[in-house]
């Protein structure tokens, strides 16, 4: 693993830590102002760091956490296997899944694209990251 790989992973660790403590401004500090975010489940893509931040902010959840389980680097992309937990604000229904996110970095170590994948989309996440099992 080279220095750039370590720097990308460190940036993602800091972003996850910020997200988990509810500091969404700090969580998007690694994002390019024109970052493209592709939410899970076929939702429409969103553009811009503010749109990414707005998506992170809980609306239907009273609690939410995303813990990275491992990182796989391929060029300028990092595939993160993660454990996501959330609890519905009104319903109390709990979400507890393992899913994937592919983060694409530019030369300045800013994230230009974030692609989120549901539990059953592992092969799509691997393909998006340029990895094959």
Task: Annotate each PLM feature.
Residues 7-10, 24-77, 123:
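A solvent-exposed, acidic/Ser-Thr-rich amphipathic alpha-helical stretch
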Residues 78-86:
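Short, well-ordered beta-strand segments in beta-rich or mixed alpha/beta enzyme
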Residues 100-125:
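Short beta-strand edge/turn micro-motifs at domain boundaries
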Residues 71-78, 104-110:
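A short, structured loop/turn motif at beta-sheet edges
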